[in-house]
């Protein structure tokens, strides 16, 4: 899980979602998981 000030989809399987007011990227590749913070 990377924590970045700006989260962007890396590949075409990345999905941008909002969870508890946080913007997150979920993907089938675990290295692409990101959270804004």
From Swiss-Prot:
Keyword tags: Ribonucleoprotein, Ribosomal protein
PROSITE patterns (UniProt xref): RIBOSOMAL_L36 (PS00828)
InterPro entries: Ribosomal_bL36, Ribosomal_bL36_sp
Gene encoding the protein: rpmJ
A GO-annotated cellular component: cytoplasm
Protein name: Large ribosomal subunit protein bL36
Key word Zinc present: no
Lineage per the UniProt record: Bacteria, Bacillati, Actinomycetota, Actinomycetes, Mycobacteriales
Similarity field: Belongs to the bacterial ribosomal protein bL36 family.
Gene Ontology biological process terms, A to Z: translation
Superkingdom classification of source: Bacteria
HAMAP family membership: Ribosomal_bL36
One GO MF term: structural constituent of ribosome
Species annotation: Mycobacterium tuberculosis (strain ATCC 25177 / H37Ra)
Entry keyword Ribonucleoprotein: yes
NCBIfam families, per the entry: rpmJ_bact
